[in-house]
């Protein structure tokens, strides 16, 4: 009787729990968006599912460990949620209220015209490039004075440009610090 109970109930439940733990550990996980930096597309306190084994391209929304990338962020295990603007080898410029990657104007239909032309808390001026941004003191020394995104790194920005603490401030995001790609908000 006890063996039948183990066989019919305990083993299947244990296997199901093991499968869920493995999927969550290696393939997918859930993260809560914290703050308004991705509005209007992702809201503060909104949950998102991440694909932890995805490849990343321009326009993808990713989650990465804040303390690994932002030198001002020193505690906790909070995550930043940002959009990839540029991938390794890309150049980035902002001029005449437009964003350019590799000399081509970026279609930013995912945000309002007003947000496309917004600056940030710091004034970078009406024109900037990776080279001018990377001369900033908050960027890590190894990333300073780059005119292109280095190998294994990404340049990211929040969709709510006027309030987003993003790559314009802290520099490039290392691929090894990316937790995953947002696949489903809920």
Q: Where are the regions that the model predicts?
A:
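Short, Lys/Arg-rich N-terminal segment immediately upstream of the first membrane anchor
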Residues: 1-8
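Alpha-helical transmembrane signal-anchor/signal-peptide segments
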Residues: 29-44
């Amino acid at each position: 009787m006890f063996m039948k109970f183990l066989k019919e109930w305990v083993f299947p439940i244990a296997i199901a729990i093991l499968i869920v733990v493995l999927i969550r550990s290696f393939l997918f996980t859930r993260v809560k968006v914290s703050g308004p930096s991705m509005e209007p597309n992702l809201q503060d306190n909104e949950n998102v599912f991440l694909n932890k084994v995805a490849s990343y391209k321009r326009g993808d929304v990713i989650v990465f460990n804040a303390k690994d990338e932002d030198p001002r962020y020193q505690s906790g295990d909070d995550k930043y949620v940002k959009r990839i603007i540029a991938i390794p080898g890309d150049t980035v410029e902002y001029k005449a209220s437009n964003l350019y990657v590799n000399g081509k104007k970026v279609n930013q239909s995912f945000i309002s015209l007003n947000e496309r032309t917004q600056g940030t808390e710091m004034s970078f001026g009406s024109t900037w490039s990776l080279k001018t941004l990377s001369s900033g003191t908050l960027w890590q020394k190894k990333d300073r004075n780059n005119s292109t995104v280095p190998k294994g790194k990404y340049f990211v920005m929040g969709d709510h440009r006027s309030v987003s603490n993003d790559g314009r401030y802290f520099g490039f995001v290392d691929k090894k610090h990316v937790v995953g790609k947002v696949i489903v908000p809920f």
